Amino acid sequence: IVGTGKSRHPQCVAISGEDGVGKSALLDKAKQMVRGYQMIPLYAACYREESEFFLRPWNDIFWEVEQCVENGLLERSITKEEQAQLDRFFKGSILGDEKPLGRLTYQLMEKAILDMFRKIAEKHKVVLFFDDIQWMDTMSFQLLNRILLTLGTERILLMCTYNQNNDVEVMESLEKLMKKDYLHVISLNPF
């Protein structure tokens, strides 16, 4: 995570490997280490069963942000009204309210989320942890790319795991980060 790319900026890390090789354990260890560096770790696991639900992993991320606010680690970076709006949005998409997201709805939500992370990043470094990112939905990948490409990797980083069998799909979803030299891939192999 603290390594730098050719452009001398911090790089995000994707950990690839087969099932049972230790990707999640390495991710957990990195999450513990991040806390020691006074960074804010935000974690979500992606599941095959939930891969069709729009923005499902982000619900966990926002829950963790709320926990950090309640525990005094973060100042409230969005208004209670914006939080209520995001809550309604996520509850609707998670409870299977299958109405397609309107373009305007998504843009408003994306803007609120970018503003939230921008405000958090003014005072804190944040690391987004996603386990089994191969199960992340397209819209979640879109939002992740947007956050990292808009705000850069100086204050917000990504660390994720994925099954090597899904390498092509994951790399296509993170292609923009690769092109900017924002992502370093580590392959774990069994002994």
Region annotations inferred by a language model:
Residues 1-191:
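Key residue(s) within conserved catalytic/signature motifs
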